[in-house]
Amino acid sequence: MKVGTDIIQIDRIEKLIDRYGDTFKQRYLSKEEIAAAKKVETLAGYWAAKEAIAKAFGCGIGAQLAFHDIMIAKDSRGAPYFTLSDEALKTYTIHSASISISHDGGFAIAVAAIDFEAA
């Protein structure tokens, strides 16, 4: 089991959205994530979650695992979970995973715990 965490100032994401608008969202989020995230706090939480997940895999966001390789969603109870792109699944076999996202005091934070094997 590997753990990753990330924290980001919500206003940093808000400034990027103000500056780049939909271009920013489309570069880092899936269409489903954009549709689900009505508030900037949610977008910041998704950003932090993707970073935390990549850190748990031990590679961070980059050539091996990109923002679009990780998709964040919520189950029927509102709990967050993630899926990986088909390309990323060629690299990782996930046995179990859990993520938590929270925001307060102007920050969004996420923690990911993932039991996996690398190919």
UniProtKB/Swiss-Prot annotation:
Q: Does the keyword Metal-binding apply?
A: yes
Check the record and name the InterPro entries matching this protein: 4-PPantetheinyl_Trfase_dom, 4-PPantetheinyl_Trfase_dom_sf, ACPS, Ppantetheine-prot_Trfase_dom
Which compartments does it reside in?
Cytoplasm
Its BP terms in the Gene Ontology are: fatty acid biosynthetic process
Question: So what does this thing catalyse?
Answer: apo-[ACP] + CoA = holo-[ACP] + adenosine 3',5'-bisphosphate + H(+)
Primary subcellular site in the record, as a coarse category:
cytoplasm
Mention one GO molecular function: magnesium ion binding
Say which enzyme class the record assigns: transferase
Pfam families listed in its UniProt record: ACPS
What EC numbers are recorded for this enzyme?
Answer: 2.7.8.7
Task: Outline what the protein does.
Answer: Transfers the 4'-phosphopantetheine moiety from coenzyme A to a Ser of acyl-carrier-protein.
State the family it belongs to.
Belongs to the P-Pant transferase superfamily. AcpS family.
Q: What is this protein called?
A: Holo-[acyl-carrier-protein] synthase
What's the encoding gene here?
acpS
